[in-house]
Amino acid sequence: MKNTFLNTVKGSLIISCQALPNEPLHSSFIMSRMALAAKGAGAAGIRANSVVDIQAIQDEVDLPLIGLSKVDYPASPVYITPTIKEMRAVAATGCAVVACDVTGQPRPNGEKLAEIVATMRTEFPDTLLMADTDTIENVKVADKLGFDIIGTTMHGYTPATTGANIADNDFAYLKEVLQATSRPVIAEGKVDTPEKMKRCLDLGCHAVVVGGAITRPLEIAQRFISAL
């Protein structure tokens, strides 16, 4: 079966529907309803965390999914689909894309990213792989490893990029990413206004993922409260 994800989301908004255990909306049911709202608004796809959330969302909407699994391992800073175990579990849901950390940091159990990619290509040949990158160097690593999609997800969230924002200097970093790879780039991370989303698309991004600015009411409310 041909994966039609890239055609479906081109030039569009993907909404990330995630809530971690310490957040008020942590519930697979709530995430499924959030996805329904996203679909109603016109989102072209959903990004979701954990097998149970992915399955609940699949039961609710027919939008294509970017799936991932956030797991904390004690001896590794990598937490987005960090090992082959999580990669397999997410891919087994049938989601169109599996996203994982590509930040060059050591993975749990000494696993190697190149081996994970090779295994996924053999076991799930129809599943697209998205690299959640943080730096130009790691964009190039992901490109060389053959990831289908390059994401800017981790820019600003790793020790090497602390404090960075995708919108800095008129999106200078994003422009570099687009120059560094010919693969589809999905902008993600701190894209918190419609204007920033549009700018990412105008610069040449294939699609844009927006999460917290839409689906995390605690964070949204805090922005208003902090202005008082």
Name the predicted role of every residue range.
Residues 1-92, 123, 129, 137-149:
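Conserved N-terminal beta1-alpha1 strand-loop-helix module at the mouth
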Residues 94, 98-100:
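A generic, well-ordered mixed alpha/beta core segment in the N-terminal half of proteins
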Residues 186-191, 209-213:
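Glycine-rich beta-strand-to-loop/alpha-helix junction loops that act as flexible
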Residues 205:
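C-terminal binding/interaction regions
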Residues 24-28, 47-66, 77-85, 102-120, ...:
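Active-site-adjacent beta->alpha loops and helix N-cap segments on the catalytic face
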Residues 48, 129-131, 185-189:
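Conserved hydrophobic beta-strand within the GNAT/NAT acetyltransferase core sheet
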